[in-house]
């Protein structure tokens, strides 16, 4: 029985082959390979097969060629000894092959074929791979694998122990081993417990098989994870604790217990904000490294959406121009070297793209005070926050991967510096008392504020867009997922992606009321040339008629006798005064007033000082 078994050579059986049940063995194997021995596999033939992408076939034919070059008697004797020893160890090690010690002698420079089931994938002719020259695997078969006995150079093969059961390879779980893996990495003695459920795939070097992404591990092993969903590992390096944002501005020297650190800003002044990646992934080059961040000014208190929109609308109604924004970004060269795709997505928010492999830097100014949201005088202003949300292009979600904030207080006319000086003065006075009383140590002045991370990533921020400009703003519903091919180079500047959904962010109450703007008042400071003190002329309406009424009331000049009114600029240009000059270019200006009477009418000349 054993001799008959040795005379049979292993065969390749396809599962979906019609002759699957009709197995037969070839006893006269020397005649079967006689033609092959007469036409040996030359180096040129191997090179041509490698160029055509069939390196594995070249390796297999070379293995068979070396096997059948050996005389039949030596081959049968070596195979019999190996077979007897392997059958004894087969039941002990659950079918794992063992190599005989005799086969490792220097004289045995052959490779013995063992009938160990090993799965390869046979491609069908009607399915073509995405790359064109490779085919998509479809059928799994059990073939024999050769154990390296002795070669002249270092062997690149490895032995794999598998259960002797023929089964179809599940398409959802594939493990592909590289041919360059050393033999000591994968042997029959160090297989993991679940190795029986992982059958080696074909060694075709396909990058994509049935749209399953391939994950590369340096330097010599690549795993194609078919059972893992793409959302589980795509952009896995972007985690909530991997970002840090810093604002270069002065912080309060007297923080209140339990409150966040207060940062003082001047209205309209630009401050740099640096965005970078930190943690264990710092320094690792990301193949897809673009992220989008949104910097916005929001209210610190937990106010409802309606209250926030009401405050923003009140602030916007009191601005000199409808184009006034709550937050602006500077076009500094230092900033634009690190960011791209800048979008003013709302009056209180700015979006841009930056690279994780480099630090992003932007210069931001805030144009609203904390006291601008109420008409009452002397009330404490509403606290404001600078909030930064960072979104990944790969997580296919409108939920940010990181969110952080810092509390700010905005002053006008260099008020931030005055506030810091006042706190320093109070702190210096307290130091004298601390020496005697021994109070808590004072805080040192720092000009760097680190944004504090937020755990709530689900709440959508309120973005303010005035009704008059709502239709002109470019925005979309969600962050659109983009393929890695689109991210290889610079993102297309024309791509407009917002991480917000517009559902009810900017909806106004059902009953809209027209906004009634209070008439703008113009104040002029005038004096006669013979006088030293200025008089204030308050124009009830910013028109030429309003100016005539104010002059008539102040200097008792009959309004019906006032003729021409001129304005003399600092350059000496004399122009006719009209409504536009009074409304837009004369508020709180100082003038010399000259009143001349000629022919029963008065001519007024306002000379700009």
UniProtKB/Swiss-Prot annotation:
Record bears the keyword Cell cycle: no
Main location: nucleus
Any one cellular-component term (Gene Ontology): nucleus
Localization: Nucleus
Pfam families recorded: CP2, GRHL1_C
The Grh/CP2 DB domain, residue ranges: 239-465
Comp. bias regions, Polar residues: 185-206
InterPro entries: CP2 (IPR007604), TF_CP2-like (IPR040167)
Start and end residues of each stretch annotated as Interaction with DNA: 371-380, 418-421
Keywords carried by this UniProt record: Activator, Developmental protein, DNA-binding, Nucleus, Transcription, Transcription regulation
Renumbered residue ranges of the record's region Transcription activation: 1-91
Subunit structure: Binds DNA as homodimer.
Role of this protein: Transcription factor involved in epithelial development. Binds directly to the consensus DNA sequence 5'-AACCGGTT-3' and modulates expression of epidermal-specific genes, including XK81A1. Important regulator of DSG1 in the context of epidermal differentiation. Regulates the maintenance of skin barrier. No genetic interaction with GRHL3, nor functional cooperativity due to diverse target gene selectivity during epithelia development. Functions downstream of BMP-signaling cascade modulating endogenous bmp4-responsive targets.
Protein family: Belongs to the grh/CP2 family. Grainyhead subfamily.
Other notes: GRHL genes (GRHL1, GRHL2 and GRHL3) show a paradoxical lack of redundancy despite their extensive sequence identity in the DNA-binding and protein dimerization domains and the fact that the core consensus DNA binding sites are identical. They have related but remarkably different functions during embryogenesis because of their differential spatiotemporal expression patterns during development.
The protein's name in its UniProt record: Grainyhead-like protein 1 homolog
Natural source organism: Xenopus laevis (African clawed frog)
Lineage: Eukaryota, Metazoa, Chordata, Craniata, Vertebrata
Gene that specifies this protein: grhl1
């Amino acid at each position: 029985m054993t001799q008959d078994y040795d005379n049979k050579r292993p065969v390749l059986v396809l599962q979906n082959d019609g002759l699957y049940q009709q197995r037969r063995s070839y006893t006269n194997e020397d005649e079967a390979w006689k033609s092959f021995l007469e036409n040996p596999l030359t180096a040129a033939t191997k090179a041509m097969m490698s160029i055509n992408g069939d390196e594995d076939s070249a390796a297999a034919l070379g293995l068979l060629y070396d096997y059948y070059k050996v005389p039949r008697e030596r081959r049968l004797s070596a195979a019999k000894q190996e077979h007897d020893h392997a059958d004894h160890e087969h039941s002990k090690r659950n079918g794992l092959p063992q190599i005989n010690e005799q086969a490792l002698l220097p004289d045995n420079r052959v490779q013995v074929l063992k009938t160990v089931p090993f799965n390869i994938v046979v491609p069908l002719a009607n399915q073509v791979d995405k790359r064109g020259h490779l085919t998509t695997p479809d059928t799994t078969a059990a073939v024999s694998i050769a154990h390296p006995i002795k070669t002249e150079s270092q062997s690149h093969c490895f032995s794999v122990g598998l259960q002797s059961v023929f089964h179809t390879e599940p398409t959802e779980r594939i493990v592909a081993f590289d041919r360059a893996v050393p033999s000591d990495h994968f042997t029959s003695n160090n297989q993991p417990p679940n190795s029986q459920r992982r059958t080696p795939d074909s060694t075709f070097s396909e990058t994509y098989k049935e749209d399953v992404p391939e994950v590369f591990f340096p330097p010599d092993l690549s795993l194609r994870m078919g059972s893992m969903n793409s959302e589980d590992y795509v952009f896995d390096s972007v985690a909530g604790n991997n970002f840090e944002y810093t604002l270069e501005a002065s912080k309060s020297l007297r923080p209140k217990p339990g409150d966040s650190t207060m940062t003082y800003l001047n209205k309209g002044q630009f401050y740099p904000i640096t965005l970078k990646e930190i943690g264990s992934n710092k320094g690792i080059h990301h193949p897809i490294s673009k992220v989008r961040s949104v910097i916005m000014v929001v209210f610190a208190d937990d106010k409802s959406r309606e209250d926030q929109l009401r405050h923003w609308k009140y602030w916007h109604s009191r601005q000199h121009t409808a184009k006034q924004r709550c937050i602006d970004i500077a076009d500094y060269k230092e900033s634009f070297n690190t960011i791209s795709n800048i979008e003013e997505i709302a009056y209180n928010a700015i979006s841009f793209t930056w690279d994780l492999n480099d630090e992003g830097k932007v210069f931001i100014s805030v144009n609203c005070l904390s006291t601008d949201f109420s008409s009452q005088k002397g009330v404490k202003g509403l606290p404001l926050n600078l909030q930064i949300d960072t979104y990944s292009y790969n997580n296919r979600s409108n939920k940010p991967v990181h969110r952080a904030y810092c509390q700010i207080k905005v002053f006008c006319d260099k008020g931030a510096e005055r506030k810091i000086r006042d706190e320093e003065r109070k702190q210096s006075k307290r130091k004298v008392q601390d020496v005697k009383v021994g109070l808590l140590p004072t805080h040192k002045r720092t000009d760097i504020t680190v944004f504090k991370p937020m755990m709530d990533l689900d709440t959508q921020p309120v973005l303010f867009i005035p009704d008059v400009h709502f239709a002109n703003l470019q925005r979309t519903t969600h962050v659109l997922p983009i393929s890695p091919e689109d991210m290889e180079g610079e993102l297309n500047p024309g791509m407009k992606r917002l991480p917000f959904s517009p559902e009810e962010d900017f909806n106004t109450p059902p009953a809209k009321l027209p906004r009634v703007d209070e008439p703008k008042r113009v104040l002029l400071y005038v004096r006669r040339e013979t006088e030293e003190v200025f008089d204030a002329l308050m124009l009830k309406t910013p028109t030429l008629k309003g100016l005539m009424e104010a002059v008539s009331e102040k200097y008792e000049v009959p309004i019906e006798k006032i003729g021409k009114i001129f304005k003399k600029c600092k350059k000496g240009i004399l122009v006719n005064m009209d409504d536009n000059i009074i409304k837009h270019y004369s508020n709180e200006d100082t003038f010399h007033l000259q009143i001349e009477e000629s022919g029963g009418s008065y001519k007024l000349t306002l000379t700009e000082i």
